[in-house]
Amino acid sequence: MTDFNIATMAQKAKQASRVAAQLNSSEKNALLNDIATAIENNSDAIIQENSKDIAAGREKGLSQAMLDRLVLTDKGIKDMSSAIREIVALTDPVGDVDKLSLRPNGIQVGKMRIPLGVIAMIYEARPNVTAEAAALCIKSGNAVILRGGSEAIHSNLAIAHCLHQVLTTHNVDEHIVCVIPDTSRSVIEQLLQQSDTIDLVIPRGGEGLIRYVSENSRIPVIQHYKGVCHLYIDKYADLDKAVNILVNGKTQKPSACNAFETVLVHSDISAKFLPLAAKALNDAAQVKVHACKNSIGFFPNAELATNEDYQAEYLAQEIAVKVVSSFDTAIGHINEFTSDHTEVIISQDISRSQKFIRQINSSVVMVNASSRFSDGNQLGLGSEIGISTSKLHAYGPMGLEALTTEKFVVFGDGQIRQ
């Protein structure tokens, strides 16, 4: 598209962000309810546009996994609308004043939650992200610029049409939600230079996309390169729990970034646990295993693990296994290979579990639970807009509050500084 100008769009989004910030909770919820209804009412049109993306994807030779993420069905449309209505039910964080304290001179000092401003989302496939990201940004009082992958352009524009119809009906600036219609790579390059108008970039997709955005942006970026999630089976583990959690965390959805990629097993219980794990992983999904020299004998057809295997995010029915001689060795391995996403310990020993929580600083640390719970909705945040594995400005799954920041508010009665 030769007439598209990203700088102009970003400027309009910046102006619209001031409108978004002033909407009250009732106004935002009314918008979101009507958006959910509009998406349902236009499901046939959205699915028709989605079919164009599917056909083009097949012609381009997209993988079946990518096509699965791209496809929209009647159920998918209903799920999208339900996700928006769940956002309606969330508490609006904007305008809350807390941490109010009285200073010796009589002034009261507090902090108020405010929107970030303009958020740019860069993502691949998954047209539902268009609707859910827009809804989260509206609810948190932000404007958003959405740049989906070229493989979903027809679907994204159809969803954007529903969003803009509702915004116009409510007499709200439609540039609160901007969907970039240009699929060229050069637009991403230009988008990442708009530091005067865009406040935050959130990339969602493969490691290559996220690294490209992080390395080329003049705007702060929420980073989450990959999910190398570890499961540590302690010598005081309940082995039945351990097997169930391993199978769930690895095989339920291996393409998810919260799936297990490495399991560490304490040597004291390895002879008991590994045969159970081998059978369970094979029965569940014929999981391919990369095993250390001390565990390879328990897994028929396993390959000998290398350091590269312990760094790998397989995103498939594949896992690395290592026997460790001590609790501290497990901690050391995790800290060496972590991606700061999610780590899990299975142990009935409270003191060891607490030590694990203290010594592992990934964004989510769990005790006796599946890594599959490392998800905004499962953690009680509602829909998540992304995951951060860098400690600034958010850490872990990001919900509504992560799309806001704080400003100081001061209440006085004529005080002056002496």
UniProtKB/Swiss-Prot annotation:
GO BP terms: L-proline biosynthetic process
Function: Catalyzes the NADPH-dependent reduction of L-glutamate 5-phosphate into L-glutamate 5-semialdehyde and phosphate. The product spontaneously undergoes cyclization to form 1-pyrroline-5-carboxylate.
Protein name: Gamma-glutamyl phosphate reductase
Catalysis performed (reactions): L-glutamate 5-semialdehyde + phosphate + NADP(+) = L-glutamyl 5-phosphate + NADPH + H(+)
Listed GO CC annotations: cytoplasm
HAMAP family noted in UniProt: ProA
NCBIfam families documented for this protein: PRK00197.1 (NF001221), proA (TIGR00407)
Keywords in alphabetical order: Amino-acid biosynthesis, Cytoplasm, NADP, Oxidoreductase, Proline biosynthesis
Gene Ontology MF, one: NADP binding
Family: Belongs to the gamma-glutamyl phosphate reductase family.
Organism superkingdom: Bacteria
EC number, UniProt record: 1.2.1.41
